Design a protein with these regions (language model features):
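Short loop/turn motifs that connect adjacent beta-strands in outer-membrane beta-barrel proteins
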Residues: 24-28, 41-50, 62-66, 92, ...
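Extracellular loop and loop/strand-boundary signature of outer-membrane beta-barrel proteins
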Residues: 40, 84-88, 129-136, 193-199, ...
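Residues on the lipid-exposed face of transmembrane beta-strands in outer-membrane beta-barrel proteins
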Residues: 42-44, 55-57, 100-104, 114, ...
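Residue-level detector of the transmembrane beta-barrel scaffold of outer-membrane proteins
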Residues: 52-54, 111-113, 147, 163-167, ...
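Outer-membrane beta-barrel pore domains and translocons
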Residues: 56-60, 117-119, 151, 169-173, ...
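Outer membrane beta-barrel transmembrane domains
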Residues: 66-79, 237-377
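Outer-membrane pore/translocation modules
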Residues: 117-234, 305
Length: 377
């Protein structure tokens, strides 16, 4: 944790205090904008007839409860059988997500992208059962995003300093929404649906829209990215997730021909769930005594205890180990959270991403297995 406390200050110092850099075209291809944080979806349009691939590993920690802007203790909500309390209360949550993405550029202005993921969640709970503490667990594939990105404007076709792009796509329901509890201390609760937040999927086909603005003022790269996922349809359990909206602002400084530092502000707003699952109504899953007329077992089961607004600050380092490949490390902490609660609040996120570009024989950059030196790699 000492390293994590030092990292943001060190990266900000590089951004602010580093001496004037030489002229750079960026670590990524000049056509796609040169530099962009790899955690932001769809950065730039790749060179025509080129592939790009991205592998990312993220760890997220959530610690303590929040209702609105007020931090709460789990003891404020139980565990207790008394009215107004819950029989099970979350304490902490850890999430590991692996994401794999690929893209191909068909023209100078259009690229198709696909992103898939796998998530592993563990949540520490305290309950009225014996033993009282246990760890709830789930894992599985997430929904898959299929998107197209079109460049609406650029001031130069080959190496733009200003460009505006739009993203249209869909999230396909490849993630499950019916994962069940396997290790609850009360045996009758095993085999029952896990709460919403432990399900890796949405169960619905969801449209995606985005808009990205990028600008270069060498050695600085900057931009703003807006994305929304709209939840319009009910899934097989007769509910839908809340729609999501994200806005990312970033500033990057390239201080070396193979390295740069970045700072981001990442805002997100999302809605609650429309209803409880069908299994809750029919079988009493997530209700006390497994009776649909009784109170919720835990605040995680209440569809209204989701949604909110948060803002994270993110610092990062990108490094080019070999031509056409980039490694990135990002660290994020929340600076504002307003949650419909009680629900677990964000503590911090750590993400490592590896990215590589693969020119095909049709690409203007194709030179066999050697790097295109004329573009500065």
């Amino acid at each position: 944790m000492k390293f994590l406390k030092i990292l943001p200050s060190a990266i900000l110092a590089v951004l602010i205090l580093s001496s004037n850099a030489l002229a750079y075209i960026g670590l990524c291809c000049a056509h796609c904008g040169g530099n962009m944080p790899l955690n932001i979806q769809g950065g730039g349009i790749p060179e025509t007839h080129e592939f790009r691939f991205k592998l990312s590993q993220m760890y997220m920690s959530m610690d303590s409860l929040r209702d609105g802007t007020d931090e709460k203790s789990y003891g404020d909500y139980g565990p207790s059988t008394a009215a107004g309390n819950y029989r099970g209360v979350p304490k902490t949550m850890n999430s590991w997500m692996t994401m794999v993405g690929g893209a191909y550029s068909f023209t100078d202005d259009f690229a198709a992208m696909i992103m898939a993921g796998y998530v592993r969640n563990s949540m520490d709970m305290t309950t009225t059962a014996t033993p009282s503490d246990y760890t709830m667990f789930s894992q599985g594939a997430t929904d898959t995003k299929i998107m197209g990105k079109y460049r609406l404007y650029s001031d130069d076709n080959l190496a733009p300093k200003t460009q505006l792009s739009t993203i249209l796509g869909v999230a396909a329901p490849t993630g499950k929404i019916t994962i069940k509890n396997t290790n609850h201390p009360t045996k009758t609760m095993r085999g029952k649906l896990l709460p919403f937040g432990m399900q890796p999927g949405s169960g619905t086909w969801d449209p995606i829209f985005g808009l990205t603005y990028q600008k270069i003022a060498d050695p600085y790269w900057m931009g703003v990215n807006f994305m929304t996922t709209q939840r319009l349809f009910l899934n097989a359990q007769d509910y839908k997730k809340g729609s999501e909206y994200t806005v990312d602002l970033y500033l990057m400084r390239q201080f070396h021909e193979r390295a740069l530092a970045s700072f981001q502000l990442n805002g997100k707003a999302w809605g609650d769930y429309s209803d409880q699952p069908k299994k809750g109504k029919e079988s009493g899953d997530c209700h006390a005594m497994l009776m649909s007329t009784r109170d919720w077992m835990t605040p995680l089961c209440d569809p209204t205890n989701y949604g909110g607004v948060n803002l994270h600050a993110t610092v990062g380092i990108q490094f080019q180990p070999v031509p056409l490949q980039i490694a990135e490390l990002n660290f994020s902490v929340p600076i504002y959270q307003n949650l419909k609660g009680p629900q677990l609040q964000s503590d911090y996120m750590l993400r490592f991403t590896y990215y590589w570009e693969v020119p095909t024989k049709k690409s203007r950059r194709y030179v066999g297995f050697k790097a295109p030196e004329k573009l500065g790699f």
